[in-house]
């Protein structure tokens, strides 16, 4: 359970032991359950913050997909103290990189008609265009 793991938002990442909390908290047993709606939203900067009461809240957000980028969450050091006897287990959990949708972008595309730009190229070729 919650021993030494903290109470996290619980983004279930398979067999990653204590689980990687979406809010940055380490969900001791919640990581295995996971929020189904969370991966589509994708919070990138949250792991340092730690949201406490996240698992009960289900947020419905319609997101216009922006450019997707690969975000590698920071490694999580999980420390667990089991008593009695006092056993300290420390392990480094490297969460897999998540694909996070960037902010929505409105792209105004202009498709001009075929513009023929005649650039008179002197005898020394096209290198002059790059300078």
Curated annotation (Swiss-Prot):
Sequence repeats lie at residues 37-40, 45-48, 53-56. Keywords: Cuticle, Repeat. The keyword Repeat applies. GO terms for molecular function: structural constituent of cuticle. The keyword Repeat applies. Component of the cuticle of migratory locust which contains more than 100 different structural proteins. The tetrapeptide (A-A-P-[AV]) repeats found throughout the protein are also present in many proteins constituting the protective envelope of other species. This is Cuticle protein 79, isoform B. It comes from Locusta migratoria.
């Amino acid at each position: 359970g919650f021993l030494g793991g903290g109470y996290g938002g619980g983004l279930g990442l398979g067999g990653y032991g204590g689980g990687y909390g979406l809010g940055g908290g380490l969900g001791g047993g919640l990581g295995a359950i996971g929020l189904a709606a969370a991966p589509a939203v994708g919070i990138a900067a949250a792991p340092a913050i730690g949201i406490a009461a996240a698992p009960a809240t289900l947020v419905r957000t319609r997101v216009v997909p922006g450019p997707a980028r690969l975000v590698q969450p920071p490694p999580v050091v999980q420390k667990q103290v089991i008593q009695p006897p006092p056993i300290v287990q420390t392990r480094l959990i490297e969460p897999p990189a998540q694909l996070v949708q960037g902010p929505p972008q409105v792209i105004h595309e202009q498709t001009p008609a075929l513009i023929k730009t005649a650039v008179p190229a002197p005898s020394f070729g096209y290198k002059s265009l790059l300078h």
